Amino acid sequence: MLHWYRGQLRSLLNELLPRWQEKIGVSVGNWGIKRMKTRWGTCNQKAGRIWLNLELIKKPFACIEYVTVHELLHLIEKKHNENFVNLMTKYIPKWRSLKQELNRFILSHEEWKF
């Protein structure tokens, strides 16, 4: 099942990333998908790399897009400062409500083993 989810998210990101890179004017050198327990995404600005949480595929499209743009903007602005907030507002005007929506979801589903 994880393989299927990964393929679905990869397919979606293959469409989202080029579109948003062009809009924002950034280029991500490398990106990947992995399971993360505490984050929806990460960005290594120096390496030009972003990682997105596999669990995103289970969330609404708007939330996936929000996290994708959020991480791409970290290629421009490392910190969550005023400039970063202004960029988020420029590209995703309703980002605050999407962030709240995403934070209402469980980050990941832990499998219970007996």
What are these model-predicted stretches?
Residues 71:
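Walker B catalytic acidic pair
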